[in-house]
Swiss-Prot record:
NCBIfam families: G6PI_arch, PRK08674.1-1. This is D-glucosamine-6-phosphate 4-epimerase. Gene3D superfamilies: Glucose-6-phosphate isomerase like protein, domain 1 (3.40.50.10490). It is an enzyme of class 5 (isomerase). It holds the Pfam family bact-PGI_C. The active site is at E198, H214, R294. It comes from the Archaea. Involved in the synthesis of UDP-N-acetylgalactosamine (UDP-GalNAc). Catalyzes the conversion of glucosamine-6-phosphate (GlcN-6-P) to galactosamine-6-phosphate (GalN-6-P). The lineage of its organism: Archaea, Thermoproteota, Thermoprotei, Sulfolobales, Sulfolobaceae. GO terms for biological process: carbohydrate derivative metabolic process; carbohydrate metabolic process. CDD domains: SIS_PGI_PMI_1, SIS_PGI_PMI_2. InterPro entries: Glu6P/Mann6P_isomerase_C, SIS_dom, SIS_dom_sf, SIS_PGI/PMI_1.
Length: 311
């Protein structure tokens, strides 16, 4: 497999230069998505938006007439997101769809919803730069915020440094169970876990600081049949002290800018997972069980989705 993370700077740049539909004023924001299409909405929580923001990663959703819904499904056929969007449209007509096509684009067309198209032919987790860039552009227009979206590109220009760190991390992780901790960057700790799971087919977990200091930290006080490898994404002095106490590998954000750090840390997660996959001799792009559960999920919801589409 050609390493898709090597193309991220181009992906970010393309998303910056692509025209998107005009966005109406946003009073409340709801994000629908799951898996690789859901994690950009989770990472958006880091920004602490100036309006009520809710993330739903499943088929259950709560919206009202004030809600602007962003429904993201890379394939366009994510059952849970389709069901959640159809449920949302019973309460609000303010919705935006981000997809490469599929059933959700058909629904958007039927309901005259704006669509932002993603390129086809990639795994969902690899298109993060497109989705997240579009999200920032949407909130800048809909909320009147002024995030410098160009900082996403600037955050990954030091690719060689991130690549070097990823190699060190992967070599340290192999043979151990990584647990990634953070406070401010907790959503990126979750992304690290997901990337290692999907690309390397390897166990990984994450937890929140300082919450873990009051329970999970005791894992490191006694010998265990498992070899854990703690990693802390450091954002403050308490993160630093927590890392020192459990002898964790420390990841320091490279920048003062939150968008630069989101881009660089997310890229680091991807690079680390691919390096780990190479060490393990597994194919990052290959999925074995996920397609099976997608098919079973669709069969469970097929009748409800078809009924809602006909309303």
């Amino acid at each position: 497999m050609n390493n898709p993370y090597e193309n991220w700077i181009n992906f970010f740049q393309e998303a910056l230069n692509t025209n998107i539909p005009s966005i109406e004023k946003i009073e409340e924001l709801v994000y629908l998505g799951i898996g690789g299409s859901g994690i950009p909405g989770r990472i958006l929580e880091i920004l602490e938006l100036p309006v009520k923001y809710q993330l739903f990663r499943g088929y259950k959703v709560k919206v009202n007439e004030k809600s602007t819904v962003i429904a993201v499904s890379y394939s366009g056929n994510t059952t849970e997101t389709i069901f959640a969007l159809l449920t949302s449209l019973k309460k609000t007509r303010k919705a935006i769809v981000i997809t490469s096509g599929g059933k959700i684009e058909e629904i958007a067309s039927k309901h005259n919803l704006p669509v932002i198209k993603l390129p086809k032919g990639l795994q969902t987790r690899f298109v993060f730069p497109y989705i997240f860039t579009y999200l920032i552009r949407i909130i800048n227009e809909g909320l009147g915020t002024n995030y410098n979206v160009n900082e996403l590109v600037e955050g990954i220009k030091d690719y060689s440094k991130l690549n070097e760190i990823s190699g060190i991390l992967a070599s340290q992780i192999i043979g151990k169970i990584p647990i990634i901790y953070s406070s401010t960057f907790l959503p990126i700790a979750e992304r690290f876990k997901q990337e290692i799971n999907e690309n390397a087919k390897y166990p990984a977990f994450y937890n929140e600081l300082p919450e873990a200091n009051h329970n999970e930290i005791e894992l490191y006080s006694y010998p265990s049949p498992y070899t854990f490898y703690p990693i802390v994404i450091v954002s403050d002095k308490l993160d630093e002290e927590s890392a020192n106490l459990i002898n964790a590998y420390k990841i320091y954000p490279l920048y003062q800018s939150i968008l630069k750090n989101i881009a660089s840390l997310t890229l680091l997660a991807g690079l680390t997972s691919v390096k780990l996959a190479m060490l393990l001799g597994v194919k990052p792009e290959q999925l074995n069980i996920i397609p099976k559960i997608r098919e079973k999920t669709f069969k469970l919801f097929e009748g409800d989705i078809n009924a809602d589409q006909n309303l």
